[in-house]
Amino acid sequence: MSCPVIELTQQLIRRPSLSPDDVGCQALMIERLRKIGFTIEHMDFGDTQNFWAWRGRGETLAFAGHTDVVPAGDVDRWINPPFEPTIRDGMLFGRGAADMKGSLAAMVVAAERFVAQHPHHRGRLAFLITSDEEASAKNGTVKVVEALMARNERLDYCLVGEPSSTEIVGDVVKNGRRGSLTCNLTIHGVQGHVAYPHLADNPVHRAAPFLNELVAIEWDRGNDFFPATSMQIANIQAGTGSNNVIPGELFVQFNFRFSTELTDEMIKERVHALLEKHQLRYTVDWWLSGQPFLTARGKLVDAVVNAIEHYNEIKPQLLTTGGTSDGRFIARMGAQVVELGPVNATIHKINECVNAADLQLLARMYQRIMEQLVA
């Protein structure tokens, strides 16, 4: 017996949509949505394909996701070619199966079933889909959100299909995410010969006390919803490669994953104060990729929890852990934002896979959420 969720997932996987190339994935979704009465608006920016689709009017529930995937890696290590979906022992293998073409298929099929049962639903059902979430994410959801906000578009609830689950579908729901702030710091010294240190100024030596103090800082202790802010040095570079040259510059890149206890400005001020304290000559470039956001218990969280409890008979954990997602952009619209998707154990890995039965279950959960919020 065929399953529409699995069939659509397989069709999407067959399209090697490496960021930001969509390779026809959105056309598949648009065709299905148009048939059930959705209005489609293409919102492409640069090399990225996006679309905004809606049906009905009033209080709005949007489903958000991305059609792009990360590279497959060494294809010889896959049990089957990564863009040829295969089911083995109930597991559907293929790049994007879990992140997040399975979720996209579940969303579309859930919408089809919902509209068939509720052709005159009271609220508005919408889709916000992009082909660039895995790479730069500069021309994707963020640009669509900016355009929607500019015309005062309404968005009350948003369910992002990111693979939130850890062991069984629905065991973890993400109702927020930490902020992400990166510092690209260059400490300036004077290059010279290692035998004549008095004629040079070693930026590595200069910066060592600063870095030692930086990594020892307790930024906050988190709160009921977020773990404590984390700072990690990601890259550090200096020198010419020669053992007799004192470097002229030291480059250090570090990233903060911060809670709602801090703002990005508070972090910047403290780092700059520390640099001044150690009397360093420096240039700095900050990159804020997302503010922290939190969706407290309310209509969306309650609907999601209800759907999971109804179909999987478990009580999900509400967590804000992990990396960033496009939910950080959508939250700017004032919407309640929650992430619910399949198990994430194999995402971005060789032999990415998802339990086929989980995708069927996910479609039913999505449909029940629609029924609670916009039926």
Curated annotation (Swiss-Prot):
Pathway: Amino-acid biosynthesis; L-lysine biosynthesis via DAP pathway; LL-2,6-diaminopimelate from (S)-tetrahydrodipicolinate (succinylase route): step 3/3. It catalyses: N-succinyl-(2S,6S)-2,6-diaminopimelate + H2O = (2S,6S)-2,6-diaminopimelate + succinate. The keyword Zinc applies. The active site is at 68, 133 (proton acceptor). GO terms for molecular function: acetylornithine deacetylase activity; cobalt ion binding; succinyl-diaminopimelate desuccinylase activity; zinc ion binding. Binds 2 Zn(2+) or Co(2+) ions per subunit. Its cofactor is Zn(2+); Co(2+). The keyword Zinc applies. Its EC number is 3.5.1.18. Keywords: Amino-acid biosynthesis, Cobalt, Diaminopimelate biosynthesis, Hydrolase, Lysine biosynthesis, Metal-binding, Zinc. GO terms for biological process: diaminopimelate biosynthetic process; L-arginine biosynthetic process; lysine biosynthetic process via diaminopimelate. It holds the Pfam family Peptidase_M20. Zn(2+) 1 binds at residues 66, 99, 162. Zn(2+) 2 binds at residues 99, 134, 348. Homodimer. Belongs to the peptidase M20A family. DapE subfamily. NCBIfam families: dapE_proteo (TIGR01246), PRK13009.1 (NF009557). Catalyzes the hydrolysis of N-succinyl-L,L-diaminopimelic acid (SDAP), forming succinate and LL-2,6-diaminopimelate (DAP), an intermediate involved in the bacterial biosynthesis of lysine and meso-diaminopimelic acid, an essential component of bacterial cell walls. This is Succinyl-diaminopimelate desuccinylase. It comes from Salmonella typhi.
